[in-house]
C-alpha cells in the first residue's frame, strides 16, 4: 500500500473543510463519473450525511460504513487486529487500512476514511481530543493527513 501525505491547507493557511466545498467537489465527481465510498469512525456518519444531502449523489456514492468500535473496523472493513493493537484505532495506519480495504471491497474509485478522538473525553497525552486522521484512497494510492483540532465535539466531527 503506497502511502503519501495530502495537504489540506489553503493558501490562507486555514484548513479547508468539506462543508464549504462539497457542492463543487460533488459536481466534479459527477461530471467525471467518479464513484466514492466512505468509512467513518469519529465523524459517526456525518461525512456520508453531508455527501448524500447533495443532489445527484446517488449516481456516484456507493456505500458508507460507520465503524465506531474496533470490532466493527475488523468485521466490516477488515482492519487488521494486530494493527489496531500495535497503533490503536486513532492512527495513520488504521485510517490507511480503512480507506484501502474499503476501496477493495466497494471497487469505488475514491474512498474516504476518518478516525480520531472527537471528545469531549477519551483523549490521552499521546492522542488528545481533537486528533483526527483523514484518509483518501485513489487508484490504490493512499493519502492520510493528521489534523489537530482545538474545538467542540460538533466542530471536530464535521
Describe each region flagged by the PLM.
Residues 8-158:
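Short alpha-helical segments enriched in small residues
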Amino acid at each position: 500500500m503506497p502511502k503519501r501525505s495530502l495537504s489540506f491547507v489553503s493558501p490562507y493557511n486555514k484548513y479547508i473543510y468539506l462543508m464549504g466545498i462539497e457542492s463543487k467537489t460533488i459536481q466534479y465527481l459527477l461530471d467525471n463519473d467518479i464513484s466514492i465510498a466512505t468509512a467513518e469512525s469519529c465523524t459517526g456518519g456525518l461525512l456520508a450525511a453531508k455527501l448524500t444531502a447533495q443532489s445527484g449523489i446517488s449516481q456516484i456514492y456507493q456505500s458508507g460504513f460507520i465503524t465506531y468500535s474496533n470490532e466493527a473496523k475488523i468485521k466490516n472493513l477488515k482492519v487488521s487486529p494486530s494493527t489496531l493493537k500495535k497503533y490503536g484505532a486513532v492512527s495513520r495506519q488504521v485510517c490507511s487500512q480503512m480507506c484501502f480495504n474499503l476501496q477493495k471491497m466497494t471497487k469505488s474509485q475514491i474512498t474516504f476514511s476518518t478516525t480520531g478522538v472527537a471528545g469531549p473525553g477519551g483523549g490521552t497525552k499521546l492522542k488528545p481530543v481533537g486528533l483526527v486522521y483523514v484518509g483518501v484512497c485513489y487508484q490504490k494510492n493512499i493519502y492520510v493527513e493528521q489534523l489537530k483540532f482545538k474545538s467542540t465535539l460538533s466542530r471536530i466531527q464535521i
